[in-house]
């Protein structure tokens, strides 16, 4: 049984809450953009972190994802976690923790930041600071 919120469910939730139609960014599976009623642009990034054997989630935020999120008026990240939990954060809040000293590189993701997600905070590999967060349990878009 899949206990993760689907990407489609996230889109329905976000579009309803933000009163905005979101379209997929070309060639980007988890990035969506729209224009809210104020005329500002909105970008949503919704990765599905993996559970680490040590009991936290991990996900990479790539330099390309960061570029797209930086080019919008409002950037939001909706992390889809096991147990139908959702973690929603503003890009401007997260990017303060994504320093140049924390950047990693590999052939697959290229330049990226590695995020470790816990129930009450996010830890970026290479950064001693933690970002406090609060998980939300998702039941349905109704």
Predicted ranges, named:
Residues 1-40, 48-50:
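Acidic-basic catalytic patches of nuclease active cores, encompassing PD-(D/E)XK
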Residues 30-32, 77, 113:
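Residue-level detector of beta-strand structural context in well-folded domains
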Residues 40-41, 123:
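Short, solvent-exposed loop/turn motifs
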Residues 4-5, 92-142:
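Non-catalytic C-terminal interaction segments of nucleic acid-processing enzymes
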Residues 37, 70, 82, 106-110, ...:
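A generic structural signal for short, non-catalytic loop/turn and secondary-structure boundary residues
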Residues 48-87, 91:
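Catalytic cores of nucleic-acid endonucleases
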Residues 13-26, 56-59, 100-107:
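Short, solvent-exposed secondary-structure boundary motifs
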């Amino acid at each position: 049984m899949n206990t993760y919120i689907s990407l489609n469910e996230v889109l329905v939730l976000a579009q309803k809450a933000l009163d905005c139609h979101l379209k997929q960014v070309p060639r980007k599976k988890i990035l969506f953009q729209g224009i809210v009623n104020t005329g500002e642009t909105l970008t949503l990034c919704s990765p599905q972190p993996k559970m680490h054997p040590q009991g936290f989630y991990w996900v990479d935020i790539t330099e390309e994802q960061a570029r797209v999120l930086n080019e919008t008026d409002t950037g939001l990240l909706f992390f889809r976690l096991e147990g139908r939990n959702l973690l929603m954060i503003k890009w401007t809040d997260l990017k303060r923790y994504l320093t140049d000293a924390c950047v990693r590189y590999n052939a697959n993701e290229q330049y990226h930041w590695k995020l470790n997600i816990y129930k009450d905070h996010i830890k970026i590999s290479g950064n001693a600071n933690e970002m406090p967060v609060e998980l939300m349990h998702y039941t349905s878009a109704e």
